[in-house]
């Protein structure tokens, strides 16, 4: 730990030393840039507009008169950017050689403009591989949540809006991978949406597929989104895979009423941004959505209420802040159709969440502290889940086991099915604080923008946890799960520090070197027995070889800390029959006794952060006519993802019969002599340990081709796609019990094994996909209308669940000792005590070793035939009053009958569920 801290301090010292020792600028060599920002046409001042000078990273905000200034700017040429919600971003090159006073006019966003952007735009070379999606693209897409916006990213498959199913972020991954979903980061207005406080209990696995639900974020309150697929800035952490940065609306906007309707969804919103003298700018948004899985049956539904209230204001001339309060209420439900008989079975989940975010920016103007930014965030959630279903009795009687401690228990039983309800009450909370110091330097032809900062997070869960509505009728009877109090689990602290240098070097007028070099240090529960530490160096590079060709690449490390569920797994329960005496002529003497074994799963002291190494290499080509081509190859490897760890312990479980142990009295109760069992079984049981046992490798090639505009048709053409491969496997050995066919009858009858066989694990799952997307966007400014047609082809959809043919390499005996099985032992025999014999002995039950091999014959890759989808969208502005949008997905209703895959001749209907249509109408008041 001390070495790690020393390394971090040294890194920060070197960054600061680099800044201090850089050639000093004289006061005369630094200038002020003063801005006056107004609306084009009305010349009204634009308040709280964000102004930045790149690549120096100097950022400021306009005041009540629309004025802003940036001081101490070294001489040189910079790119000035001015942005505000509802306006086109202003971008211009500014040559600074003296004090400047600039007048900037912002143009309101409108379809009457010559250029309309309704697609995702690639980020500049030399920074993280990412796509930016603006408000116009979100409106044209008619997105209902953040999940819908993701389909604009290269390689993503076009799908219908479906709010009835949980939507998680899976970038560059072709399967619902646990670590990928858990390691995706969603940052809203500077505060990450943490899922570290999620806990499980009952029948749920602590390694279940988890991730932030994208349905929670309504699309109508979003101003813009940045989706980072590559190596992120060192400013962002606690992630392994993708990063999505969401900026909500902030600024003066008219009253806007929106409504979107399709057969499965109704979504309405109301929003307004207004300014109060001396109080700042206020923003209000309310969103309601209701969705059904199938409107004909309505067996699944989802309802969402989102409300936000924000304020932007200035404490002083140099201190600007934004505060936003959000409320979310969401309800998932599935059950019987309203027209069907209501048998009482259903599932519902309610989520009520309040979040408060506060972002501030102080223009300090010092050499080593140009701008000080800070973020504070607090989220309190209440998630209640109710599961109600019938528990069936299939074997005459069903034991009702509720024991929470190890021992022998006389249990009641049910003889007929009953309706049971299981309830989970979760109360996760998350606090976040962050501070960043930004400053810049210029020396000759080089410019450097530095970021140095730290953040802190605290996550907890104070919920009641899982419990049964009626303990005499448990939801999962005779099951491993038992009630669990989430409030018993302690919270977790996380600290991080980071430093980053964005470097630009103009070697000449053509050749430019850009780099983003950063280091991030993350620690969880520092100095405690659960402490984890991780260093995450990150580098993005680009070099302009010619005016039309850029080479770029990068390598970086991401790190995800384990959440509460991984650090504090639930107890393990195992229940075995100890006595089952059911005399027909003596009801009073009937007795059912179970032995319950409880294993107190230790907290995960050996668990490490899941880390992903990202490597990228690509080219950016600028072609005549504003055409552009980007090609990127990537490889993301996570060698230590979270998963179950195979670890055993053994225990004794006694069985009592009338021959030994049970004392039956005619007409009276039956009692047990626990010291006189008829049989004592030695049972293997897993401990429930969590480890870094999963490895995932994602690799592929992405491309994005802007083919420019066909001017006579006013149509822009965009062609993108990706070839992706995901391979995932378990790094642990495989283990299993001895097959019952090679054991005496009493072993299989009593469900025990003499030892556990161990095999090398060569199994893996591999997925491949090759997808192309062609978009035609036609803009007609005179009609205030834009139309787009999107065609997508999935050329390859490949899946291979490989199971290797392997022989045992060892076994774990009843003393939990591992004993090897070498190659020259495969033709021998093992007795029930694990003793090896080269020749089969007489009079001893033995197991032929070669028969214990795992042999498979059906591990064949599955390949599906290509399918395609064609969708159309139209957006029309109705002057300044409002607008109308229409869309049709799978507009040719292409649902062919094709072979399911290459391994079968059965025809199945493909591309089903993709046909949809809808309309959106909005009014500006």
Across the structure, where does each feature detected by a protein language model lie?
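Short, acidic, small-residue-rich periplasmic hinge/interaction motif at the N-terminus
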Residues: 30, 36-42, 47-54, 83-85, ...
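Short acidic/polar hinge/loop motifs at secondary-structure boundaries
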Residues: 71, 191-228
